[in-house]
Amino acid sequence: FDRSRARDMGATRYLTKPIKLDSFIADLDQLLGDTFTATFWGVRGTLPVPGESSLRYGGNTSCVAIQCGNAPLMIFDAGSGIKALSDHMMGMNQRITAKIFISHPHWDHINALPFFVPLYIPGNEFEILGARHGETTMRELMSAQMDGIYFPITIREFGARVFFRDLGEETIEFDNITVKTMLLSHPGNCLGYRIEYQGKSICYITDNEMFNPGEPGHNPGYIQHLADFCHGADALITDTTYTDAEYLSKAGWGHSSVGQVAELAARAEVENLYLFHHDPDQTDDDIDAKLEEMKNALKMLGSNVTCLAPREGDQIKH
């Protein structure tokens, strides 16, 4: 009864009885607070990788949910990780208002959107934002994979109110949150995002390639622009697909290596670096080794950046 009454009165977040003392302070901070929380629902790139070798970090593709205080949830990308987020949100039994930011429409960033159940629930409200590709709008990009042929349900079946918005390089503001966008170095139009809230900031930069010096695609001006975009961020979540050795045979594939990311994080003077979008051929042990390679690279640069490789379900708070 209390939940139904709260929803009818327009509440999107509330505390329910009985109060759980072990989580009360965290719940209250979230409800009233000036912090942001990022939850990782998928950290892999290219395609999901089930199996024993991916149990620790998880095998789902890109999806990160960011909560700023009591503002509507922001979801970044709709890879296979968004299915677990869907299950979590459905278990909350409350009306959902959220924004879904798409970096780009490659499959590992959009192909689980049709399985995001809250989109089909009347009373929920979503805005789906991302870069258009030529004359193709974000609405057309998202509906193309739900045309009744490749997937049996079309976007006309969405029960929630769903709005689409095309983005370029721009700044948007809502609920005391500022979101800035930047076009990244990746095939097609791929957007990076910087989220600012109450003096804190988090950058979501995937997919992206910076190239090594001497390679045809190396652009120092672009790298400096990206460092300026990320400068001083409390958290940088970024494409770190390859080790330096792996990158040598995969230059031009649209993804970054450990050394490239280490130099970016050090130049941008971010507080915390989170490795993301792991190559599907990398096992959990390989990611452990890549994390150690990153820590050593940062140390060689004299950087004090804290570095982690999040696992599915991990949360970071700032």
Where are these regions (language model features)?
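Alpha4 helix (beta4-alpha4-beta5 surface) of REC/receiver domains from two-component response regulators
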Residues: 1-13
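C-terminal output helix
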Residues: 19-28
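Binuclear metal-dependent hydrolase catalytic cores
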Residues: 33-206, 210-216, 226-227, 284-318
